[in-house]
Amino acid sequence: MKMETFLVCLFHNAAGLHQQIQEILYLLRMHIYETNLYLKQELSRLIYPNRQLSFVLLMPLSLLRNWDDIEYLTDIVDDKQTLHYAANLLTIYVLHLSMYQKLTKPYFLLAVKRVSEKLNKKQRHSFYEVLVTSETLNNYENLPKNILNTLMFAVRYVFKPTPNYSEIIAELEKKNKIHHIIFNMVITDFQQIREQHMCKHLCETNNELRQECKEIIFDLKVVGNV
């Protein structure tokens, strides 16, 4: 097995390793990405054949600052499989970088925005649905607060530029237990109508959701503009 391929396997199975080992792997990975074009291509090939999207979403921030590389996001296609793939990569990406506090809002949102811009309203809604229900986020209750807030911010951004209050409420009503990330997005994006509509709606339809609304409003005020 080539050393580069071995390192790729290490990177993808590092979740259970001690944090110090993870940090070493992260720094090593950054160095390899910056010096080894072969590994960039190899990683992209292993994750998703003939797609550069994986390379863009998984690269370290030092490379993500390269605007030319960001253009690879235009490789997104319209099928459902790719939406699932892109959404899961985004969640993996933000989780990985958040572990080392390497994440800064503009760079992650840039990737989210570039994917979102390639989709029409229906496709963007599907992408949003996949993102907030992806396998990674199903374990959101175990996520540190800073990671959850970052994911919340990303979901808000994906659903723009034309968020529709009625559509989001309809989506909430489809779920027996509301997802914290969707809920945070709704409250943050619709602060103007929260008191008039959101609380009234929840109070009339679901006491459990009403209580959950109260519990997270304080967190949002503390977080502010994440």
From Swiss-Prot:
Asked if the record carries the keyword Heme, the reply is no
Q: Where is the signal peptide?
A: 1-16
Q: Which GO terms describe its biological process?
A: symbiont-mediated suppression of host NF-kappaB cascade
> Which keywords does UniProt give here?
Glycoprotein, Host-virus interaction, Inhibition of host NF-kappa-B by virus, Late protein, Signal
What are the annotated glycosylation sites?
N164
The answer to whether UniProt assigns keyword Signal to this entry is: yes
**What induces or represses this gene?**
Expressed in the intermediate phase of the viral replicative cycle (immediately after DNA replication).
User: What is the similarity comment for this entry?
Assistant: Belongs to the asfivirus I226R family.
Main function? Plays a role in the inhibition of host NF-kappa-B and IRF3 signaling pathways. Mechanistically, promotes the degradation of host IKBKG through enhancing its ubiquitination leading to inhibition of both pathways.
Q: What protein name is recorded for this chain?
A: Late protein I226R
Annotated source species: African swine fever virus (isolate Pig/Kenya/KEN-50/1950)
